[in-house]
């Protein structure tokens, strides 16, 4: 039998016989690792420990100490849910039940479920877990699989699509129950330490609104009860911080039915925050020599065909028939920027050319996937596109990486970095992709950053460096990105004249410092619980006159000393206590209480939103501090602490 080379995470290599399994490799490394093996990651794909290796590959062994273990555990918990459901409701038909970032779900039909049903199903799940049934992989012929699912159109659809080339097909069994599944799974149901069913929602088969409506049951699972309890506490805190709730309470944005789903309206408070975010990155771009451009919201589809978006992205585009000609709302800004570049005659002396645009784009997400600002139809990207010579790639990407770090550090956000490689659906040659991936890997290596490889997660036109940042609740969010593109310059025939007086092809770099304003805004709302840093807050100071007699002094303070800031006067005839509480509820960073004593002395009493207070403060002293706090973009108001 032929030999294959298996590359391990530390770079070491093992020669194994073709057909060896993941578990075989683990035992070759050591008997203890072999005993502990749960699954494997082969070339970035999570697989069963019985997966046979037939070609040279990169392999990560998964044990119960691995990051991937929880994903495997939750996949098994989804099977336990499905078994429990069918024990209690044999008429239920199963669709799909994958693990998710926070747990798992299973789409089912043929049964009406409510909260009481979930309680009973959860109790049955506990029975199955306590029984500690072995979970075993089994192979069935296609004919047998179709017989098993004679009355289940969803499993038959899977057999006819994803599993169309498989014979035999993979099943997993536990006790007397089985499910069509690629795995992997833990060894027995008893490994699942704690489960909880969370909620019920509606879903469409394949995410297509034209298909049948299914019932989606969400749940989660952990190794221990304490881990589950911690998750549930964080989940409750997340509900309190939900940006949809705070967006309404703080009058930041709305998505009314009349406008359509996924189409947010920004109120003055929300737009004030967005303008600060825009000004911040615009200044960073200006400092690095970017030129600001603007492109229309729609183009002829000829442009999208030229760019490759029509071929690769048409299902996610909004298309319009205008005078018998097809147009498309732009899902990305890059083709417009490439077209602008193509209008000029460029020399190597002109490069790099850097374009920036806060450009609105439109992507047709399924209605069921839309959620607040996190998934919308219309959103704005702080897009930057650079056209550079090949030998300038690393220098430019390093500058972009510095910009991204400055943005995330400004908001005190921890982050992780990943190199996303070629997806299955892509444009361009193998040579071009390999060159692009090598360039980005070189940048990451020289930066000294720790980074992961996300195989197959690149854009269809090139590999990318992705930043994921962590919020106050420990959740990870997709954020800034840097993408190399050797393909679009080819498609648009972009050229510049080199030092040798010959035409050359520039490299295009795509870059976003936030990712999208909508998602970044959403994360900031929840990360800060609406308590934005003073420089970002829609209302930075609220002046609270003790009585109507002090309103004139309040206006004088606002107009003479604080006219450069976002300041409001609370002039309603309320008690001071109610005025303070209202300002606190509105998350205003600073409150200035002014009564007869302050007016006579020409001072203010300063309170911050943490209910700390300083009395008899000179107005100019407060103003100067406020100016420096805003200029330095400090995360917390800190005047009272000085």
Curated annotation (Swiss-Prot):
Catalysed reaction equations from the record: tRNA(Thr) + L-threonine + ATP = L-threonyl-tRNA(Thr) + AMP + diphosphate + H(+)
InterPro entries per record: aa-tRNA-synt_IIb, aa-tRNA-synth_II, aa-tRNA-synth_II/BPL/LPL, Anticodon-bd, Anticodon-bd_dom_sf, Beta-grasp_dom_sf, TGS, TGS-like
Record region (Catalytic): 242-533
Principal location: cytoplasm
GO BP, sorted A to Z: threonyl-tRNA aminoacylation
Main EC class the enzyme belongs to: ligase
A matching Pfam family: tRNA-synt_2b
GO cellular component terms, A-Z: cytoplasm
Domain TGS: 1-63
Keyword Nucleus: no
Gene3D superfamilies (UniProt xref): 3.10.20.30, 3.30.54.20, Anticodon-binding domain (3.40.50.800), Bira Bifunctional Protein, Domain 2 (3.30.930.10), Threonyl-trna Synthetase, Chain A, domain 2 (3.30.980.10)
Assigned EC number: 6.1.1.3
Binding-site positions, Zn(2+): 334, 385, 510
Keyword Nucleus (UniProt): no
Leader peptide range in chain numbering: none
Cell location: Cytoplasm
Domain of life: Archaea
Alphabetical keyword list: Aminoacyl-tRNA synthetase, ATP-binding, Cytoplasm, Ligase, Metal-binding, Nucleotide-binding, Protein biosynthesis, RNA-binding, tRNA-binding, Zinc
Co-factor note (free text): Binds 1 zinc ion per subunit.
GO molecular function: aminoacyl-tRNA deacylase activity; ATP binding; metal ion binding; threonine-tRNA ligase activity; tRNA binding
Cofactor: Zn(2+)
NCBIfam families: thrS (TIGR00418)
Role, per record: Catalyzes the attachment of threonine to tRNA(Thr) in a two-step reaction: L-threonine is first activated by ATP to form Thr-AMP and then transferred to the acceptor end of tRNA(Thr).
Stated family: Belongs to the class-II aminoacyl-tRNA synthetase family.
Quaternary organization: Homodimer.
Name the UniProt record assigns to this protein: Threonine--tRNA ligase
Taxonomy of the source species: Archaea, Methanobacteriati, Methanobacteriota, Stenosarchaea group, Halobacteria
Gene behind this protein: thrS
